[in-house]
Amino acid sequence: MSKNNLNETESKIEIEAKVVELLSNDKFKVELPNKKTIIAYVSGKIRINNIRILPGDKVRIELSPYDPTRARITYRFK
């Protein structure tokens, strides 16, 4: 019997968003293009490389299909 392996990147939804507010513990309130706000946290690569994210920055986020109210910030646009 073989297991059906679902690739992590295929199940994620990537969209661009704008950082609205800084929250504690590397969490941010981001605004989606449809004007909905959700909470996003910083990915490990951004945290390791000490990339600063400030309100007003445009970022790329990954939304999980299981919990669309939370996201992970994967890239900050310059």
Swiss-Prot record:
HAMAP family: IF_1
Species this protein is from: Onion yellows phytoplasma (strain OY-M)
Name this protein carries in UniProt: Translation initiation factor IF-1
Pfam families: eIF-1a
Gene for this chain: infA
Record-linked InterPro entries: NA-bd_OB-fold, RNA-binding_domain_S1_IF1, TIF_IF1
GO terms for cellular component: cytosol
Family assignment from sequence similarity: Belongs to the IF-1 family.
Subunit structure: Component of the 30S ribosomal translation pre-initiation complex which assembles on the 30S ribosome in the order IF-2 and IF-3, IF-1 and N-formylmethionyl-tRNA(fMet); mRNA recruitment can occur at any time during PIC assembly.
Keywords on record: Cytoplasm, Initiation factor, Protein biosynthesis, RNA-binding, rRNA-binding
Gene3D superfamilies to which the protein is assigned, alphabetical: Nucleic acid-binding proteins
